[in-house]
């Protein structure tokens, strides 16, 4: 039986966050180092924001190359901490499949009565192997919550290649960041 104080404790606000991370062959070497560094920095930023706002992080992470797979959480469950390290990069860049896997969580994302706008991070360094499939998956994400696009989509670019898919993915142009300059992400309104 809960004690008296637990009965009246206000539940924390949940903040659903999903990462879709490219580990294809083009990410080998220095780019994988940049990816790991960026995920560590993002973890610190998100945990700081959550602590300040008495927020419970609900984190999922999908790794993709030729196929997409869950690394943290899955369609049914989340983690409260982003703690991953990637050591291998191989295969092709199948972004569309990964985005569809992330979309499969969208109807489960907001089970809690109190939640912040879900955030979906896409981290990649190149165009996918099937751009049309990726653009279609992006359009499906934009409709994941019906007529209201409440999903905040943040694009993180590794390298200097212009990637039109990231422009189409991001909710707005100021939500496209280079992973070696994540300091600017602190100024983005992720807690909307």
Language-model regions, residue ranges each:
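Short coil-to-beta-strand
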Residues: 9-19, 60-62, 70-75
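…and closely analogous acidic/polar surface helices at protein-protein or active-site interfaces
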Residues: 14, 25-56, 135
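DG-centered beta-turn motif at the end of beta-strands
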Residues: 21-24, 35, 61, 102, ...
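Alpha-helix termini
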Residues: 45-54, 106-114, 142-148
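Von Willebrand factor
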Residues: 69-72, 77-117, 128, 152-165, ...
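VWA/integrin I-like adhesion module and closely mimicked acidic/polar interface patches used
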Residues: 87, 126-172, 177-178
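C-terminal "exit" segments of structured domains
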Residues: 178-192
């Amino acid at each position: 039986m809960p004690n008296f104080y637990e009965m009246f404790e206000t539940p924390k606000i949940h903040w659903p966050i999903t990462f879709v991370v490219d580990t294809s062959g083009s990410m080998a070497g220095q780019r994988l180092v940049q990816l790991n560094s960026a995920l560590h920095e993002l973890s610190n930023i998100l945990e700081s924001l959550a602590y300040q706002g008495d927020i419970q992080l609900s984190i999922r992470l999908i790794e993709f190359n030729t196929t997409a797979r869950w690394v943290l959480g899955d369609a049914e469950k989340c983690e409260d901490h982003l703690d991953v390290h990637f050591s291998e990069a191989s295969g092709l860049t199948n972004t569309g499949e990964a985005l569809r896997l992330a979309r499969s969580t969208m109807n489960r994302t907001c089970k809690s009565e109190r939640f912040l706008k879900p955030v979906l991070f896409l981290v990649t360094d190149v165009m996918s192997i099937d751009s049309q499939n990726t653009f279609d998956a992006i359009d499906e994400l934009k409709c994941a919550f019906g007529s209201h696009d409440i999903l905040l989509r943040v694009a993180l670019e590794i390298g200097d290649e212009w990637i039109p898919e990231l422009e189409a993915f991001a909710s707005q142009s100021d939500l496209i960041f280079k992973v070696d300059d994540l300091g600017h992400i602190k100024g983005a309104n992720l807690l909307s």
